[in-house]
């Protein structure tokens, strides 16, 4: 199973890529994290947030792996603990499908995409830069995996 992070945005600062890569490389071969960047829609005064999100939805859907479990990150999503994520990983692995975590653009995710997702997940009640969410998600996926392996990284 592969874990895909499909994220609207590009040209992230170097420290974002460094942080993301650090956690992605720690993952075992059977649970690799792959980042798929989606170009954000150009914004102009004549474009509504809905039209921007709809255009980004089409790009996101094109980047999603076929038959992947879609987990949309959304401020109104469910709050999960790291332990809940750790419990989900083995179940997802048994299911055999790839998992795609979707990070929207500045306006969020299109409602059609959110309704397609099997899970709406909130990463934090705080407002975070989207690039930082990539790093945070990669770290939490690594931490969840380390819990399933009784690895000393997680010391709760």
Curated annotation (Swiss-Prot):
GO terms of molecular function: rRNA (pseudouridine-N3-)-methyltransferase activity
Entry's Gene Ontology cellular component terms: cytoplasm
Protein's cellular compartments: Cytoplasm
Pfam families: SPOUT_MTase (PF02590)
Major localisation: cytoplasm
Keyword Methyltransferase: yes
EC code: 2.1.1.177
InterPro entries to which the protein is assigned, alphabetical: Alpha/beta_knot_MTases, RlmH-like, tRNA_m1G_MTases_N
PANTHER family: METHYLTRANSFERASE, RIBOSOMAL RNA LARGE SUBUNIT METHYLTRANSFERASE H
Known function: Specifically methylates the pseudouridine at position 1915 (m3Psi1915) in 23S rRNA.
Cited NCBIfam families: PRK00103.1-4, tRNA_RlmH_YbeA
Family to which the UniProt record says this protein belongs: Belongs to the RNA methyltransferase RlmH family.
Name the record gives this protein: Ribosomal RNA large subunit methyltransferase H
Gene encoding the protein: rlmH
């Amino acid at each position: 199973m592969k874990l895909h992070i499909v994220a609207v945005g590009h040209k992230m600062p170097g420290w974002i890529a460094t942080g993301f890569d650090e956690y992605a490389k720690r993952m075992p071969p059977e649970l690799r994290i792959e980042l798929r960047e989606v170009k954000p829609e150009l914004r102009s005064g004549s474009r509504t947030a809905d039209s921007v999100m709809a255009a980004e939805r089409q790009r996101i859907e094109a980047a999603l792996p076929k038959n992947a479990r879609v987990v949309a990150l959304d401020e109104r999503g469910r709050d999960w603990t790291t332990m809940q994520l750790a419990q989900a990983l083995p179940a997802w692995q048994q299911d055999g499908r790839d998992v795609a975590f979707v990070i929207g653009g500045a306006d969020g995710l299109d409602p059609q995409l959110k309704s397609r997702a099997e899970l709406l997940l909130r990463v934090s009640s705080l407002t975070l830069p989207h690039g930082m969410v990539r790093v945070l998600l990669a770290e939490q996926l690594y931490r969840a995996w380390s819990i399933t392996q009784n690895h000393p990284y997680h010391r709760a």
